[in-house]
Structure formats: structure tokens, C-alpha cells
Design a protein with these regions (language model features):
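Catalytic core of membrane glycerolipid acyltransferases/transacylases, capturing the structured
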Residues: 1-49, 64, 78-84
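Non-catalytic C-terminal accessory region of glycerolipid acyltransferases
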Residues: 35, 39, 52-188
Length: 188
């Protein structure tokens, strides 16, 4: 699980890394990347929604030894996409539920990946986040909010350490509700 910070690139690395991106968010950005370096876009898998087909494709890639990267600080592009609002940088912010539901379905370990530029070089930080994400049927939304909150805490820590290196190209706080108010509008 990564964020829109620093620079993420795996060219020349010994592990095959595939980035899973929302198609709607990525169209223009991917076209720009394709012009700059076609090798990078070859490592992108675009999805419209995180459903059963996406989970099957991801499981096949994991079974083949790939590492999958999903940014956890991007909400679904389509209206009504499932989000949870958690505390983040002194306010409430929406975070996608998809990464947590998929990690639960795939029963795979979850690592956090941050990239920070320091002294003219990018440094990659990997953290073990969870050996397994478990979302029991009872209180599922509460468990999702807990995992998203833990992720938001780690992201906030990195934002405080390198405040000009976290970026999103849309209004990140648009539609945010009070933390814990994850009801009513189809986004919970």
C-alpha cells in the first residue's frame, strides 16, 4: 500500500511490481507517462472498480510472485465509491475501502511503501503493516475504519516529516465527513 508521495519506480528491481490504478483517475496521467517512459506504464493495471474479477487477477499475480501496489490515499473515481472517513492531518478525510477489502479477500501480508526525497536522492521506506487483514462480518465497517485510520496515521507521519512531498491532483478533502460518520450517501 503506497501513497502519492515521492517517486515510485521499480525499473531494474529484482521483484516484479505492478501498480493497480483507478482507470478514471489515470487516463491523462498514464498518457503522459507512456510518452515519458513506456516501461513504466507496462507495470500499470487499470481497473474501474475493485470487484471479484479484480481480486482474481490480483491473486493470480501474487501467486506468480509479483508485488502489487495500490495507493491508499486515492478514493474511487466513480460517484458512490466506497470510502470511510478517518482522522487525518487535524481533520476528517475519505479513504477508499477497496484496499482493505481486497487484502482481506487475498489473505496476503500488507506492507506500506513510502518514497521520500532527501539530500537529492529518493529513499524507499517499507514497513510491515499487517500479516493479514481480517474483516469479520460483524462490525466490518468498524474494522475497515480501524485499518484505514492506522494507514492515515502512518501517512500523516510521513507528511509531517516531508510536507512538500505528498501530493494528490484533486481535492482530497472534498466530500469528507466527520471522522466516524460513514453513513448514508453510499460511500460507506
Amino acid at each position: 500500500l503506497s501513497t502519492h508521495g515521492g517517486r515510485a519506480r521499480s525499473t531494474g528491481q529484482p521483484v516484479r511490481v505492478t501498480a493497480i490504478v483507478y482507470t478514471e483517475h489515470a487516463k491523462r496521467f498514464n498518457a503522459m507517462l507512456e510518452k515519458a517512459d513506456p516501461r513504466f506504464t507496462a507495470q500499470l493495471v487499470q481497473v474501474d472498480d475493485f470487484g471479484p474479477q479484480t481480486a482474481i487477477m490480483m491473486q493470480q499475480r501474487i501467486d506468480a510472485g509479483e508485488w502489487l501496489v495500490i495507493v491508499g490515499d486515492r478514493v474511487p473515481a466513480r460517484e458512490g465509491g466506497r470510502t470511510v472517513t478517518v482522522p487525518f492531518l487535524d481533520g476528517g478525510a475519505p479513504f477508499a475501502q477497496g484496499p482493505w477489502v481486497l487484502a482481506h479477500a487475498l489473505a496476503c501480508p500488507v506492507y506500506l511503501f513510502f518514497s521520500v526525497k532527501s539530500r537529492g536522492r529518493y529513499h524507499l521506506h517499507f514497513e510491515s503493516f499487517a500479516e493479514r487483514i481480517v474483516l469479520p462480518r460483524t462490525a466490518r465497517q468498524t474494522h475497515i475504519a480501524t485499518w484505514a485510520g492506522r494507514f492515515a496515521d502512518r501517512l500523516a507521519n510521513h507528511c509531517h516529516a516531508a510536507p512538500y512531498q505528498w501530493f494528490n491532483f484533486y481535492d482530497f478533502w472534498a466530500g469528507a465527513r466527520s471522522p466516524g460518520d460513514n453513513s448514508s450517501d453510499g460511500r460507506s
